[in-house]
């Protein structure tokens, strides 16, 4: 079962997204801000995907994404935000996110995007495992 971290300061949306993901075979944990999300990440759970808002109290989504990228280059990050301007999208992708959805979101579309991100992450991971070089045969 895939572990998903949902970082969204709107409590109702956070609960709705987590409930929907849990009903669809994911294990979702909701956090209301980035600091709580950091605690969850350091708490030992290995998350497979992060969904984050941009506009949150304290640490915003851009700073959160940059910090996550510094710690883990491979975990997919999807922004789910009300910001629909190009500058925000650009900043998000430059911070290291993998996808961007504008609120209000369609939960079925969110699921499709998550599945695509997880599929690409699995492919990238399997390529790393299969590109191990064959050791040379040494004759003595």
What are these regions (language model features)?
Residues 51, 56:
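Receiver (REC) domain active-site loop signature in two-component systems and cognate sites
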Residues 3, 116-140:
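Short, Lys/Arg-enriched segments at the junction into DNA-binding effector domains
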Residues 30-49:
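Acidic, metal-coordinating helix/loop segments flanking the phosphotransfer/catalytic sites
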Residues 10-29:
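Two-component/phosphorelay signaling modules centered on CheY-like receiver
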Residues 57, 85, 103:
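The feature encodes the CheY-like receiver
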């Amino acid at each position: 079962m895939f572990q998903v971290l949902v970082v969204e300061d709107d409590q109702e949306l956070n609960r709705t997204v987590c409930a929907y993901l849990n009903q669809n075979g994911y294990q979702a944990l909701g956090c209301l801000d980035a600091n709580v999300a950091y605690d969850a990440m350091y708490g030992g759970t290995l998350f497979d995907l992060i969904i984050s808002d941009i506009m949150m109290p304290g640490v915003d989504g851009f700073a959160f994404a940059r910090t996550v990228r510094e710690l883990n280059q491979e975990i997919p990050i999807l922004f789910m935000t009300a910001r629909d301007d190009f500058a925000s999208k650009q900043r998000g992708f430059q911070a290291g996110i993998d996808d961007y959805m504008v609120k209000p979101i369609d939960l079925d579309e969110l699921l499709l995007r998550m599945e695509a991100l997880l599929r690409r992450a699995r492919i990238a991971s399997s390529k790393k495992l299969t590109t191990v070089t064959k050791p040379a045969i040494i004759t003595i």
